[in-house]
């Protein structure tokens, strides 16, 4: 039985989500930290994200997680402590922690997630490492203990995990280094090539996330950036079909991985997936036209 004081943590490169059982609340913040003069915390979470691409040279803003694994253990520990402290209003009590990790990483990398909670000074009574695909399935109200095969595609910021679930376990899993970051970089490069315009990563993400609404309104994406030729800030309208075209290559990379997993799936589980479809999760899975392209494939 899960005790009353417990936390479930989903660490993503872009976002961190923490569920508190005691008050049935969920906190979602950007998984970013701003460090001043290489040592002092200047801002964290959404506040750090607001400063991204705008901060002076003495403030470094970074993601402590990269490609599904912990890249900066010290700052990740500081973030976990700060977020748990915020959720408990400064009164951190002994609690059990359940943390979701990718399946297709090494045992050493998985151990790092356990050590992260142990060393974050959050009074952990018990630490359980849960495979992320299983946690995703439970979060979507899928009966993961059923014998029915389930295909889950989790598209995150810099990785995508494709998994087959059945009988409470993971039958097959594949982690690839493609996600929202690659999508945004494709948008930036296309805008630069076609319009001689430099835009930031946050602007590229805003363009990508607004494509669906813009298409409904019959509009292009109006963006502000720096003209490479004259070196001055300018405004441009980017056609939505140009953005869709540049994203398709990365969509196909993910779809190819789905096909590889399906080719290795036992026939009976494959039949279940054919009947019940694919479950999409992760922030970048909402990118316009991905689901449509996957269905056609």
Predicted feature residues:
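Nucleotide/phosphate-binding catalytic cleft detector across ATP-hydrolyzing
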Residues: 1-157, 165-278, 285-297
């Amino acid at each position: 039985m899960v005790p009353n004081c417990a936390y479930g943590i989903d660490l993503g490169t872009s976002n961190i989500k923490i569920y508190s059982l005691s008050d049935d609340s969920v906190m979602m913040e950007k998984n970013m930290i701003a460090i001043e003069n290489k040592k002092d915390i200047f801002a964290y979470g959404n506040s750090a994200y607001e400063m991204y691409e705008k901060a002076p040279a003495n403030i470094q803003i970074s993601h402590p997680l990269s490609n599904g694994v912990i890249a900066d253990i010290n700052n990740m520990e500081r973030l976990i402590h700060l977020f748990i402290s915020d959720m408990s209003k400064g009164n951190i009590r002994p609690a059990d922690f359940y943390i979701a990790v990718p399946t297709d990483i090494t045992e050493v990398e998985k151990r790092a997630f356990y050590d992260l909670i142990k060393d974050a000074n959050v009074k952990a009574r018990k630490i359980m490492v849960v495979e992320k695909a299983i946690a995703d399935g439970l979060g979507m109200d899928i009966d993961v203990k059923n014998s029915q095969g389930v295909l889950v595609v989790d598209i995150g910021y810099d990785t995508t995990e494709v998994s087959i679930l059945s009988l409470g376990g993971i039958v097959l899993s594949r982690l690839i280094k493609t996600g929202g970051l690659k999508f945004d970089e494709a948008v930036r490069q296309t805008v630069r090539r076609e319009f001689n315009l430099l835009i930031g990563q946050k602007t590229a993400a805003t363009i990508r996330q607004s494509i669906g609404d813009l298409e409904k309104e019959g509009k292009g994406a109006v963006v502000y950036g720096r003209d490479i030729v004259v070196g001055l800030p300018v405004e441009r309208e980017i056609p939505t079909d140009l953005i869709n075209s540049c994203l398709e290559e990365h969509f196909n990379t993910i779809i190819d991985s789905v096909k590889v997993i399906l080719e290795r799936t036992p026939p009976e589980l494959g039949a279940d997936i054919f009947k019940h479809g694919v479950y999409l999760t992760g922030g970048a899975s909402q990118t316009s036209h991905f689901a449509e392209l996957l269905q056609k494939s």
